[in-house]
């Protein structure tokens, strides 16, 4: 999935497959924490989520060093950057950032100095201009800085179904602006 700029049918297949994978791991009580293009392999056109190296079980107590953040800056959810608890919403944020890259071919929070990228993430300022306008509202909603504002699995899947049928992916989500 690192190549980006997938055509709509392939984008739907990858985004939907990744959404189903996240639903399965969340159902098992696991949070991946590092959903990004480099951790999604395409096998016969189907996404496979890899690298559970920093994943954790949702009920586990975290043993981390204060101030240490692990991950790729443009794909770290705001709550990871600020040291807050991670939840399934953290992975939905990573899903949206990864899907935005696949849809537009560019990282949604840009490139450049780590501090600048992290600031754009924390402020919820993705650049989705290269993304198909039919899926942009879903990605924008899932990239909300506040985890409580992000859509859940069933909302994501319903919005993706709208997108797959040529309609805007807004039917099942509230669009924040």
Which residues does each predicted region cover?
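Eukaryotic protein kinase
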Residues: 1-175
């Amino acid at each position: 999935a690192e190549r980006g700029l997938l055509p709509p049918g392939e984008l739907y297949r990858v985004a939907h497959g990744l959404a189903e994978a996240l639903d399965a791991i969340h159902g098992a009580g696991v949070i991946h924490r590092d959903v990004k293009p480099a951790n999604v392999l395409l096998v016969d056109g189907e996404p496979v989520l890899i690298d559970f190296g920093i994943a954790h079980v949702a009920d586990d107590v975290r043993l981390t060093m204060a101030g240490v953040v692990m991950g790729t800056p443009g794909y770290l959810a705001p709550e990871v950057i600020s040291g807050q608890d991670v939840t399934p919403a953290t992975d939905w944020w990573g899903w949206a950032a990864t899907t935005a890259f696949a849809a537009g071919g560019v990282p949604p929070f840009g490139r450049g100095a780590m501090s600048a990228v992290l600031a754009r993430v924390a402020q919820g300022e993705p650049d989705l201009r290269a993304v198909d306008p039919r899926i942009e509202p879903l990605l924008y909603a899932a990239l909300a800085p506040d985890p409580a504002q992000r859509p859940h699995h069933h909302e994501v899947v319903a919005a993706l179904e709208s997108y797959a049928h040529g309609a805007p992916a807004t039917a099942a989500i509230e669009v924040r602006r």
